[in-house]
Amino acid sequence: MAEKFESLMNIHGFDLGSRYMDLKPLGCGGNGLVFSAVDNDCDKRVAIKKIVLTDPQSVKHALREIKIIRRLDHDNIVKVFEILGPSGSQLTDDVGSLTELNSVYIVQEYMETDLANVLEQGPLLEEHARLFMYQLLRGLKYIHSANVLHRDLKPANLFINTEDLVLKIGDFGLARIMDPHYSHKGHLSEGLVTKWYRSPRLLLSPNNYTKAIDMWAAGCIFAEMLTGKTLFAGAHELEQMQLILDSIPVVHEEDRQELLSVIPVYIRNDMTEPHRPLTQLLPGISREALDFLEQILTFSPMDRLTAEEALSHPYMSIYSFPTDEPISSHPFHIEDEVDDILLMDETHSHIYNWERYHDCQFSEHDWPIHNNFDIDEVQLDPRALSDVTDEEEVQVDPRKYLDGDREKYLEDPAFDTSYSAEPCWQYPDHHENKYCDLECSHTCNYKTRSSPYLDNLVWRESEVNHYYEPKLIIDLSNWKEQSKEKSDKRGKSKCERNGLVKAQIALEEASQQLAERERGQGFDFDSFIAGTIQLSAQHQSADVVDKLNDLNSSVSQLELKSLISKSVSREKQEKGRANLAQLGALYQSSWDSQFVSGGEECFLISQFCCEVRKDEHAEKENTYTSYLDKFFSRKEDSEMLETEPVEEGKRGERGREAGLLSGGGEFLLSKQLESIGTPQFHSPVGSPLKSIQATLTPSAMKSSPQIPHKTYSSILKHLN
């Protein structure tokens, strides 16, 4: 452990003493190297960002970042615990002391991973993307209310804890204060946003932009979450603008004229209809998500939704809770930016001339802060004049190019995500109390197990939609779709089998008609006697005797077959009349004619429906694809059995009635009722079912499910 610490300290210059151990590289921020380490004082893993102070520009950036992150306190913003100097020394609240150091360390909240690393595995589900987008907008609403522009929003700067699906905005190294009451035109740095997430206005006017540039970057990130790839990935700024114009309509004529003066080659007379609209770039998203994205990715920043307006869009209504979307109570103003620049200039002037004026009676804290500086000189951002452009600093993300054998993240979650509204650090020499304050303070109302958020959902939707269980919701929807497909397949196969039954019935009817025609021909006794006399008068040869014997045998077989068929039909007729006598005189004639004529058909249908029942039962046992399928199938069976409670005294009678509905019995009952044509039939089902039971075969009776039915409507409901 000590050797590893010494190696990292020698290579990267990390000098924090023995308090922080187990250092692991995470990547580079906007202006510094980031490591993770374990704080031995409280046994917590934290993220530590080192900022090297080499020139006035780096000092200014550090002053700006520290001032911003110390005041921002939100559930969707990475928390900052401490600002340390070399060897882990404590720094005072006076930011002017930074000018005396060569490096500074920002100890902040450790997050498990970032969105860029998550998207390397592929696109997200739309529910997950919507949840992360809501948290991003929630954080942006707070940041913009504090008059701060992030200016470097990209997936690598959005950190995620996968355990609770909390997203937080980090890396404010390129953020700056923008007071809306003052004009910053011409005094803003160029090209700070990563090229792929730059808005069209930022490409046209690099020194003139507003908070809308963060919203454009947020829209590009949302599209990237849905597709798994960058929405507009241009190789250079000209190609970037071309890709945007191919998909984003230019509605206003003044915007088209400005484009015509800059890149006339790519400008058409009608720019309202793009060649490749967002519907083609994002073919799989919902209509609500597409409408939401089209209102964010607008060419004109004046038409673009703000963070607050985006949270009020119907697409975000599932999570939106305005009372739990706070804004800054202490926003920045132009004075904060002016004071930092003046302090930096005065302090550096004091340092550079310290050897000449070492006997000066004024101490560092007694130096005057306010002078009569020209406002244009104050608003000028020296970052635009640096040798290394900010674009190059932002574009390179070393986190993605770390060696594979290095550990990037720690499995254990670092901290709870809640924090107090205003930090109150009573002991500046130690920050262990800040961890306790972090863990014991209020929690975000839209997080897991948050009662205000859940109460709001109950009040609004009358049911709780837990945002942290999207996978279960999707599994349920998939199960419903699979169940629907299975039911469609089962219905189709059953229809095909019913077609086979009808074919078999038609074949049996044809054979019966043929047999009846043969029986209808009868036996001509006179012809037989005449033939016999004629044969007896002739010489009886062996051939004639054989023919006579054949004729006698055929006649005897024909008579035997006729007797058997008559006995079978008479037996069925008597059996059917005896059973149907219980229906009463109202339905005697119609039921008798239908039942007697369909005696053999009833037996065939009963036997076939029994086989269908067995096949469907076996198919149902083999088609479970998930535990949800089996669980809900069992639940439906149990609910069906519990619909009719059985009393102790009537258990035997209802048990007998339950056996009446076999696979063939159900089909037979519905067919006979339809053929009779008596929709006004409302008598108890017990007696006709007992009569029909006698006509069912034993095999069909054995395979019938034991489900009690007491009314005709319940039978039809079960059949359907």
UniProtKB/Swiss-Prot annotation:
UniProt KW Nucleotide-binding keyword: yes
Entry EC no(s): 2.7.11.24
Covalent link location (Peptide (Met-Gly) (interchain with G-Cter in ubiquitin)): 1
Leading EC class: transferase
Chain segments annotated as coiled-coil in the UniProt record: none
Modifications the protein undergoes after translation, according to the UniProt entry: Phosphorylated at Ser-189 by PAK1, PAK2 and PAK3 resulting in catalytic activation. Phosphorylated by MAPKAPK5 at other sites. Ubiquitination at Met-1 leads to degradation by the proteasome pathway.
Domain of life per record: Eukaryota
Protein kinase domain: residues covered: 20-316
Residues recorded with modification Phosphoserine: 189, 386, 554, 556, 683
Main location: cytoplasm
Record localization: Cytoplasm; Nucleus
Keywords carried by this UniProt record: ATP-binding, Cell cycle, Cytoplasm, Kinase, Nucleotide-binding, Nucleus, Phosphoprotein, Serine/threonine-protein kinase, Transferase, Ubl conjugation
Name by which UniProt lists this protein: Mitogen-activated protein kinase 6
Species this chain originates from: Mus musculus
